[in-house]
């Protein structure tokens, strides 16, 4: 092989490079082009032995090795789209049975065989889940739901009280025909628990029965699972401990919403499974995920020094950059490598959609700081929009994408391009699986664990500590006496005066306590609990 270096200003050499590096699969109708990433022949040769170790590690993971050492768990999202790969018959049966149950349940909901307790057809879904439990379903709904087909989805993915009130107020007249789906792997994550409690309160204060219109997706024997079974909820689906939230989209977390919008969940699984097969190829240039992982590695000097800007030129993929933010950044953003060395790894991801972004931050991408590479995503097949004034929308969209790609290259800005022949459940499943495998391979190249999230757990613990501190502060103020921040800090033997200030400010402006003094001068403030 004689691969020319990245030569944006030499069209002849760049064409040769493009032809050498282009990957295509006819069955999936998918192309991957890394020719405008700064990968050279020397790196190809140098990375081959490292990639062989990465391929072996991924093979071991798929066979059931303890990939998540921190939690002593296997990592099995690849089994979800091909149950025969699972390391035991019990797991294979569990996956196959769950797919069948989801198909039966969603078909019964849509046909009216399963109705509300008032005998009405379900019309809406309130999906309660955070992180991967919310982003994955949101991506599927925004990407694949057809007009006037299936149930209408609404999402509670935060504990913003105003946001919760707005969603519940919107559903006020539809409570009797709304299906409530609560997703929480452990069953104890505060955000979905709080959102569920708020939704349940509205349902029950309006005289409706919560269990008869509620579905849980959670681990077997979790707090939520036990509650749902004790109260005889409409249905529960299993979220196995070997599936992480950010890779749960081909399990019940993704298949249930697909079924409820009457989309082809089998094709979605097939697309992911087919891409899994293609990305098991140990030949570097014949494996699209390996090509992308190599491009990430080269572009960021193996340290994630360049951000990834995701530009999908299709409205249906507008949520995809947010989905990739979690998949990539939660997986790769690690302080330590596998040996415990401090490495501060990661890959920052942001984006929206083209051609909107051409009128936003593409100006900086072309002429500003060169600290990124772009991932373009295009779809070739368009609908039958009329040709008006000799103009077709799809032609212009494609032209804008190609023009942006060339304009960036002219300024020596790197990009890779993923092209889909059509956009449907099959191609979306393949696209998601492509990025999942790329993340896994890249993590092996930089020697980090992609399947744990100690930073997330640290954030949860810190939040719990703050909430506990608030309880202690409120206990002190319960005697209706005046207290300064310094006095409260002394009573609590706490040096965290800043957090005490933030907590008290929140309490005061939510009409629980009064404050005298200047907010600009925290030491002057005196707080008191008001008698009702």
UniProtKB/Swiss-Prot annotation:
Keywords: Cytoplasm, Gluconeogenesis, Glycolysis, Isomerase. It is an enzyme of class 5 (isomerase). The active site is at 330 (proton donor), 359, 460. Pfam families: PGI. HAMAP family: G6P_isomerase. Catalyzes the reversible isomerization of glucose-6-phosphate to fructose-6-phosphate. This is Glucose-6-phosphate isomerase. It comes from Prochlorococcus marinus (strain MIT 9211). The lineage of its organism: Bacteria, Bacillati, Cyanobacteriota, Cyanophyceae, Synechococcales.
